[in-house]
Amino acid sequence: MERRGRMAKTPTGQTHQSPVSKRERKPSMFEKESYAQILRERLRESFHDVQYVEPPFDDSIADVGKEWKSALAKLKFANSYRMEPLKKFQAHLVETKIQQILKDSLKDVKYDDKAPHLSLELADGILAAVKEFAYHRYKFIIQVLFIQKTGQAINIASRWIWDVAWDNWVEAKHETESYVVLALVFALYCE
C-alpha cells in the first residue's frame, strides 16, 4: 500500500519527495514595496455601485438624529464649590470677644475642684460666640486650660498642619492671683 503525503515510499523502499505545488507568498503589509499593492487591492474590492436608494418615510432620519443629539446635550453649570472663604477669619475681632467672655465669666471665681467643669462651660460659650461671627465653612477647635498658680513653670505647645492663607488661631489669657486661664481658638477653613 502506498502512503500519501509529502514523503512517499517507492516499492523499492526508498523515499522521495512528491512535488508540492508552491503557492505564491502573500505580500506583507509591513514591507514597504507591497504595502501600496495591498491598499490598491483592498480599495478595488470595496467599490460598489449603488443601484437603488429607498426614499425616506414621513419622519426624516436626519430629524431623528437631531432630536437624539439634543437629548444628549446637557446644560453646563459653573462649579459650585469655593476655594476660598466668603469672609476671612479675623483674629483681632475674635480675640477681643474671647477676652470679654473670660473677664465676664471669671470675675468672682476662685480656683477649686470645679475648674474642669468650668473649662467645659467656657469652651462652649466661646464656641457659641465665635459662631455668631458667621464664618462660612470654618471649623473651630476650642481649648481652655485652667492652671492653678503654685509657683511652677509651665510650657504649652501646639503643632498643626494647615493652609496658612485661610486658617488661623487666637489666644486669650485671663490671670488672677490664684489661677491663669488660657483659651485657644483654632479656625480651620474646610473647602
Curated annotation (Swiss-Prot):
Keywords: Cytoplasm, Cytoskeleton, Disease variant, Dynein, Membrane, Microtubule, Motor protein, Transport. Changing Y52F: In T-haplotype. Expressed in testis (at protein level). Expressed at the pachyten stage of the first meiotic division and in later haploid spermatogenic stages. PANTHER family: DYNEIN LIGHT CHAIN TCTEX-TYPE PROTEIN 2, T-COMPLEX-ASSOCIATED-TESTIS-EXPRESSED 1/ DYNEIN LIGHT CHAIN. Belongs to the dynein light chain Tctex-type family. May be an accessory component of axonemal dynein and cytoplasmic dynein 1. Candidate for involvement in male sterility. It is linked to Could be involved in transmission ratio distortion (trd) in mouse t-haplotype which causes male sterility. This is Dynein light chain Tctex-type protein 2. It comes from Mus musculus.
